[in-house]
Amino acid sequence: MRHFLSFIILLQVLISGCTSQLRYSGNPLFPGWYADPEGTVYNGIFWIFPTYSAPYNDQVFFDAFSSDDLTNWKRHERIMDTGAVEWAEKAMWAPSVIERDGKFFLFFGANDIQSDDETGGIGIGVADSPEGPYRDYLGKPLIDKFHNGAQPIDQFVFEDSDGKLYLIYGGWRHCNIVRLKDDLTGIEPLTDGTLFREITPEGYVEGPFMFIRNGKYYFMWSEGGWTGPDYCVAYAISDSLSGPFERVGKVLQQDTSIASGAGHHSVIRIPGTESYYIVYHRRPVGQTNRNSREVCIEKMEFDEKGFIKPVAITREGVPARKAR
């Protein structure tokens, strides 16, 4: 009995030691003001592509960040800037990256156009690696007009289960889905014959994101004003890519003791696992400048019915882990 108790005590000490040495990412993930992060995994490496958070006239480039364990992040500076895009002048926002045939395509918004009479919208950059450098793929915007009331910003590239690519985008409380050509040189009609199909759910403002889990389409978006404390993330679930998407509820929002304006997110799934992470931006307590936003990460979990559990924002972030 004495030997058994000694073994239990030793085991508790070992477990305690392992727990105390567990490394966490911490929040924010990396220094600097950044927003609208898209997180993904390429070749066993975590990548985050954010907006540089600054006045519009200073938003003329993108940085990217990579990590092999979610805790140590390397910054890749100016993977793309307005010097590589003749028609882009300012407000380069919300990069979304997809790999296709050995190339990496970065979709972005530029110029914050307010009408069809202005130059700007959603463009595409192309590179040989995730860290770029990216060059303009089309020499013009892919989408440069308002369709169904949607401002051409906040683009997210979505790959369906059959390998087809779609672009889900839109500001001004309207969201569209379009089908991309295989070579990404333009769009083509959806199955119903339309080019721009509106899929706007109740409460939608901007920042769409979609993923598939157990055959269901999870559509997520940001609500509220991006400069205010009420900015948050909500979601819907559907059996179809094009909906209908009936709002389930909020999944991420502010904690007044930590930060406000928690929104414009993306989701990372560890390949081959059921481990999900939500990557988002928030404004730390004490910061009143609208551009003082930082990139953070939390674990995202589901209940037995497949609904997303509410996510609490933290200062600790998530434990270190590999993507392989």
Predicted feature residues:
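Positively charged n-region of N-terminal signal peptides that target proteins for export
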Residues: 1-4
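Bacterial N-terminal signal peptides
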Residues: 6-16
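Carbohydrate-active catalytic/glycan-binding domains of CAZyme proteins
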Residues: 18-324
